[in-house]
Amino acid sequence: VKNTRSSEDIDKFINKRRIYDILGQDDAGAWIAKTFPDLIYIRNKEIYGWGPSDEWVKENVQSKGALGTKYPNRIWATEGDSPAFMHLMAKGLNNPDKIDSGGWGGRFGLTKVANIRGMDIAQRSGVDESLYDPYFMFTNTSEGNESINRWKQHIWNNLSAKMTWTVTSTCDDANHHPIAIIGKDSTMQIIYLSAESGSKVSLDAGMSYDPDGDNLTYNWCFYQEPSSYKGLVSTDNNKSSHLDLLIP
């Protein structure tokens, strides 16, 4: 890239790139972070603990048709590297450009950290990341792997449902996730609202629906960890389709 583009074009190229690194399995990440210091480079060091059990995989994945039979038995961690892909999915508050918001791929700090080393196995193979010191990457917040664990049941449900799709002949024979609508907004975009302290914000999800005609349940929650406000937020009517939220 540096040999074929101007400095301005390199900057444009780098600004379009996002790298999500699981544990650091060789020294390529250190070289990249050193060579392109302005790159958004995430190294997730708190990745395990959310994956389903072998029994769950057998029942919900491997038992489902020809595709399921291709799913291998676990050697290390089930779906161990999948959070790198899930970081791109529009679920919950996830936004690849706001890495501190949290989502299925985890949650990361906004300050780069120096010299985050990769896996021990990489070091034992002769890789020496210290050759590129200092290099800087974004990494996990103090929430650690709990930032993925809080969503794990939803991740499992999603995988199980999609495996069922592969063995059903019609759409009606499979289950599909409900469509969440806030006000009249049915997109997967993040909704931003401005409000003053002491005012009330009304959130209405009453137009949400399930494409299969199943009944809906609601559970509004305040995700405190990524918030700048660390006090209590009342969500007393959080099981209703409508939430009135008093801004602290």
Which residues fall in each region the model found?
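N-terminal acidic, glycine/proline-rich low-complexity segments
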Residues: 1-202, 208-211, 215-230, 242-245
